[in-house]
């Protein structure tokens, strides 16, 4: 039986397994030849060998492997102060871990598994991050921009997302409902290469602080496009906490924390084939908590 050429991914290396020609023998004809040889002095016969050709050849795979950009997405960040510069370094380190990763068909990508622990020993720095309802300095702060940027590229390539959680509070580098938070040992971002070909992830940071992920594979349906929209977010007003201070004159107020509203947003995915809508589905509901506004008021 003929065997088609195939492709495997081992230790992030792509291997093409060559095709094999199929060989078989017509049993009925062979039995007839054997009978004839038993009753004949002629001992030379041509065996009834049949050859079958594989449908997929090595050169076919080689010509299609990593030839198309399935999707790309970029976000930007600022490095104008120490905190943001630290964020930028964390973003650069995490994107380098992902750059060049190759996924076999059916393979699952785990952000935490690929990027690994975000530690000082690995070069990560302390920067602002969300933790337990507060903005705190955390080693690896900013890495969620990497996972969110990759999430957007993955969505546009129409790959299957199996684990994604939005941030506790809103973020400024992607639209509402389009972020993906991560925490090593906790929340992860995962997706599956649900195509029939290997996919290579390219990720880099440009000199002007733009983070880009590009997914390279084989586009077997160039007429398909994927779009996303949110019909509108429900605004959740931020709670206000007052701290009475007798040392301040009555009526005087001092805003200690500005606070921010929360949001609930539904995100939908539309798939078009040659410009015609073929499917529409709800992708996710993302809930962002409001940040408490804290005001000190004088009662003296």
Regions found by a protein language model. Name each.
Residues 1-300:
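Well-ordered beta-sheet/strand-loop patches within structured domains
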């Amino acid at each position: 039986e003929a065997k088609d050429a195939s492709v495997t991914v081992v230790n992030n290396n792509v291997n093409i397994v060559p095709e094999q020609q199929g060989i078989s023998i017509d049993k009925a004809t062979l039995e007839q030849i054997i009978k004839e040889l038993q009753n004949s002095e002629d001992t030379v016969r041509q065996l009834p060998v049949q050859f079958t050709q594989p449908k997929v050849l090595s050169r076919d795979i080689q010509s299609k492997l990593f030839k198309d950009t399935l999707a790309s997405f970029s976000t930007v960040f600022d490095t104008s102060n120490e905190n943001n510069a630290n964020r930028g370094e964390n973003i650069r380190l995490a994107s380098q871990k992902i750059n060049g990763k190759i996924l076999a068909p059916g393979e699952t990508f785990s952000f935490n598994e690929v990027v690994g622990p975000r530690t000082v020993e690995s070069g990560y720095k302390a920067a602002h991050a969300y933790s337990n309802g507060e903005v705190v300095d955390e080693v690896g702060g900013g890495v969620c921009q990497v996972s969110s940027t990759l999430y957007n590229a993955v969505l546009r390539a129409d790959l299957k997302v199996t684990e994604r959680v939005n941030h506790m509070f809103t973020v400024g580098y992607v639209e509402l409902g389009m972020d993906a938070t991560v925490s090593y040992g906790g929340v992860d971002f995962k997706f599956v290469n649900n195509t029939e070909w290997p996919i290579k992830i390219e990720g880099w940071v440009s000199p002007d602080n733009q983070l880009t992920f590009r997914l390279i594979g084989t586009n077997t349906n160039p007429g398909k496009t994927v779009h996303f929209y949110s019909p509108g977010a429900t605004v959740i007003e931020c709670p206000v906490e007052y701290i009475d201070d007798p040392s301040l004159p009555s009526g005087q107020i001092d805003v200690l924390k500005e606070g921010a509203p929360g949001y609930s947003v539904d995100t939908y995915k539309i798939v078009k084939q040659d410009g015609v809508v073929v499917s529409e589905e709800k992708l996710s509901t993302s809930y962002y908590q409001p940040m408490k506004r804290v005001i000190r008021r004088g009662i003296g």
